[in-house]
Amino acid sequence: LRYFAHRGLHRFQAEMWSEDEWKHELDWLLKKRFNMFMLRIGGEDIFPLAFPDICDFAEGDAGNPERHGFDDRTPISTLEERSQLRGAICKMAKERDLIQPVDCGTMTHWYSRTPQSFIDSEKPTFLSQTTSIYADKCGLVWDIRDDRNLENYFRITKAYVDNFGHDGLFHTIGLAERLFSADRAENLELKKYTYRRISEFLKKQYPASKLLVGSWDFSMFWHNDEVSALLDELNPEQCIIFDYTSDTLDEKTNFENWSVVGRFPYIFGIFHAYEPSNGVRGDYERIERRMKTAAEDPYCKGFVTWQELSHGDSFMLEYTAANAWQPVGNSRAELLPRYCTARFGKLARMFERIYNELYPVTSLFVWGGDKENEANNFFNDYTYDQISTLI
């Protein structure tokens, strides 16, 4: 499981949980036999640890009233409190033998901004974007063709490792959600170069490590043959494709067509929903068809769920927990009666009937990137377009 930095109702948003609530959550992970989790609450609190002579915790506490939307990262708590909570969570996770991947490389994103003090002092060169998303300087990616920028990114990783530990597993998003050239081939070459540069530098710093390569950008911006070409340039002994988009609505661009099956290590995963979508949803027939492919493939190394909110659809969490270890005998049809009995007790059969009667509608709620209008594929949900065809 992974826990994200969106903000909203307390139940759904891990950034708002206390240490005691995190203890309860990590114990729940063990109960459900999950063995890995990712904490995605931003990296601003790592900068004072990585660059103590430049950045301090107090800088991030005031926020910036001139920035709005994604650019406004006004903290819910102080950065120092966040850092202390991160340390407590990592310690509890280690005590429970949970794997914790560590971010590396071009990690700047909407939820992980560069402090203004670092920009003013270090003056990193940035990659120029052709899209406006995250275009504020604090959200731009440093140009890692410059050795100094790459080394500084890895100073953040080292600070995390030194303060919170690591299990030999690292993670990169590459240049996800961004375009840097109007020329598709030029844009692709830059993205491929970035993956190579990160993996090669990581190999030097942590020789025995593994690198999870996030699939988010593949699902939205890459063509199948482009993903396949990237695999030719990555080391399968080091890299694992971290595909948390296996349930996408898109039948053309998904792991089955990337040439990973039977060829390159990958993890099968369910994204399930964008942050605003907190209801029952999902096309389980689509998931189970693709899951069968992964379950029969020795190159598939695991199962992950990467929802943008933490406890939106409780059935999907139970479904993931069951199928991650045994993808036989745990189909939606087989699991639903057990789930309803455990969750609803005497009302189990009534809720089972409700779930089944609503399924023809809830199965239409499937996330998916808009490949035809790539710049518009964030937080769009095409469910209503599908439902309108039935009316």
Identify the residue ranges that each predicted region occupies:
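Compositionally biased, low-structure terminal segments
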Residues: 29, 58, 307, 379-380
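Catalytic-core regions of glycoside hydrolase
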Residues: 8-9, 35-65, 71-355, 359
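C-terminal functional modules
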Residues: 359-391
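Enriched - but not universal
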Residues: 20, 25, 31, 145, ...
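An acidic-aromatic substrate-binding cleft motif
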Residues: 1-45
